[in-house]
Amino acid sequence: MIKIAVAGGVTGGHLYPALATLNELQKITPIDVLYFTVKGKLEEKVLKDYNFKTVSLDVKGLIRPLYSFGNIKRILKILNAKNIVKKALKDFKPDIAFVTGGYVSYPVGVTAKQLGFLLYIHEQNVIPGLTNLKLSKIADKVFVSFESSKKYFEREVFVSGNPIFIHQKKLLNFDKKTVLIIGGSGGSEFLNELACKLAKKMKDLQFILSTGGKNIKCLEENLRAIDYIENMADYYQSVNCAITRGGATTVSELLYFQVPSIVIPWEGATESHQIENAKEIEKGNLGFVVREKDLDLNNLIDKIKILSSRERKIIKKENPATIIAKEIAKEVLK
């Protein structure tokens, strides 16, 4: 039995790598999980399906630039959260704390180390987030998703890859070539509009759009809109190609399932995270990176034709979640 305290949420990019790792860890040994959530955010909804203990924290991320006046109240909330975390950790007495970034990870990671517990962290993006950079200085082990991330840390890091959350695993049958368009867990109005334009122009293809719950006004018969795709792995394995944003989880999944892809990074991401993540697709010879400001519809259609005609190769490899789970088990159970 391993008792593990976990933090990582607000977005699917932090939440699902943590859940993927926990899923793999419980295949090795029974686990008892204490999960720190952010009040009102995604993880509170998702974790209702899990038999985890949870502690909800009322915290918010810091505004950029960091010296903004509005951060005073946010810092006070984080300090208050540390007191709640301290009591919860003392009561739970974990063997290890595992955090996957985002502002909720900071009070959990710092407090865990102050109380003498092991701390492992995982960074999903090529460019590390502020929380993980800070925590890396005190963590017992740091996992990163990409080789390109190593230069940002002032210590040794372990390149594990980004844990892949696999809900189901089966091939779907489509009656024509299919393009998957996804804008991350929150969706993308830009990609939703782009999907409509492409469906009108490319009647010989079928488009499947994950809208993120956003309404779309498009009546094209070859466009199927889904609010949120639960069994993403099934689609990744079955479509001919994909058009996506450049979130770390999405890029990692594209690489893991070897999906021919066009990545259009969201330009508003912190410190150009998505642009750097997207470059990993070109490094892996999987497809193209297209900036929003440079997007030309006809040129994009040409790229889709190239990628959708490629023969798909599903390469079986170890899930990074398994790699991290084995490292946790090896350390705690030794």
Swiss-Prot record:
<dbReference type="GO" id="GO:0030259">
    <property type="term" value="P:lipid glycosylation"/>
</dbReference>
<feature type="binding site">
    <location>
        <position position="229"/>
    </location>
    <ligand>
        <name>UDP-N-acetyl-alpha-D-glucosamine</name>
    </ligand>
</feature>
<keyword id="KW-1003">Cell membrane</keyword>
<keyword id="KW-0328">Glycosyltransferase</keyword>
<protein>
    <recommendedName>
        <fullName>UDP-N-acetylglucosamine--N-acetylmuramyl-(pentapeptide) pyrophosphoryl-undecaprenol N-acetylglucosamine transferase</fullName>
        <ecNumber>2.4.1.227</ecNumber>
    </recommendedName>
</protein>
<feature type="binding site">
    <location>
        <begin position="11"/>
        <end position="13"/>
    </location>
    <ligand>
        <name>UDP-N-acetyl-alpha-D-glucosamine</name>
    </ligand>
</feature>
<dbReference type="GO" id="GO:0005886">
    <property type="term" value="C:plasma membrane"/>
</dbReference>
<comment type="similarity">
    <text>Belongs to the glycosyltransferase 28 family. MurG subfamily.</text>
</comment>
<keyword id="KW-0997">Cell inner membrane</keyword>
<keyword id="KW-0131">Cell cycle</keyword>
<dbReference type="GO" id="GO:0071555">
    <property type="term" value="P:cell wall organization"/>
</dbReference>
<dbReference type="GO" id="GO:0051301">
    <property type="term" value="P:cell division"/>
</dbReference>
<dbReference type="InterPro" id="IPR004276">
    <property type="entry name" value="GlycoTrans_28_N"/>
</dbReference>
<feature type="binding site">
    <location>
        <position position="274"/>
    </location>
    <ligand>
        <name>UDP-N-acetyl-alpha-D-glucosamine</name>
    </ligand>
</feature>
<comment type="function">
    <text>Cell wall formation. Catalyzes the transfer of a GlcNAc subunit on undecaprenyl-pyrophosphoryl-MurNAc-pentapeptide (lipid intermediate I) to form undecaprenyl-pyrophosphoryl-MurNAc-(pentapeptide)GlcNAc (lipid intermediate II).</text>
</comment>
<dbReference type="GO" id="GO:0050511">
    <property type="term" value="F:undecaprenyldiphospho-muramoylpentapeptide beta-N-acetylglucosaminyltransferase activity"/>
</dbReference>
<feature type="binding site">
    <location>
        <position position="125"/>
    </location>
    <ligand>
        <name>UDP-N-acetyl-alpha-D-glucosamine</name>
    </ligand>
</feature>
<keyword id="KW-0132">Cell division</keyword>
<dbReference type="InterPro" id="IPR006009">
    <property type="entry name" value="GlcNAc_MurG"/>
</dbReference>
<feature type="binding site">
    <location>
        <position position="185"/>
    </location>
    <ligand>
        <name>UDP-N-acetyl-alpha-D-glucosamine</name>
    </ligand>
</feature>
<dbReference type="Pfam" id="PF04101">
    <property type="entry name" value="Glyco_tran_28_C"/>
</dbReference>
<keyword id="KW-0573">Peptidoglycan synthesis</keyword>
<dbReference type="InterPro" id="IPR007235">
    <property type="entry name" value="Glyco_trans_28_C"/>
</dbReference>
<dbReference type="GO" id="GO:0009252">
    <property type="term" value="P:peptidoglycan biosynthetic process"/>
</dbReference>
<dbReference type="GO" id="GO:0005975">
    <property type="term" value="P:carbohydrate metabolic process"/>
</dbReference>
<dbReference type="GO" id="GO:0051991">
    <property type="term" value="F:UDP-N-acetyl-D-glucosamine:N-acetylmuramoyl-L-alanyl-D-glutamyl-meso-2,6-diaminopimelyl-D-alanyl-D-alanine-diphosphoundecaprenol 4-beta-N-acetylglucosaminlytransferase activity"/>
</dbReference>
<keyword id="KW-0808">Transferase</keyword>
<comment type="pathway">
    <text>Cell wall biogenesis; peptidoglycan biosynthesis.</text>
</comment>
<keyword id="KW-0472">Membrane</keyword>
<dbReference type="GO" id="GO:0008360">
    <property type="term" value="P:regulation of cell shape"/>
</dbReference>
<keyword id="KW-0961">Cell wall biogenesis/degradation</keyword>
<keyword id="KW-0133">Cell shape</keyword>
<dbReference type="Pfam" id="PF03033">
    <property type="entry name" value="Glyco_transf_28"/>
</dbReference>
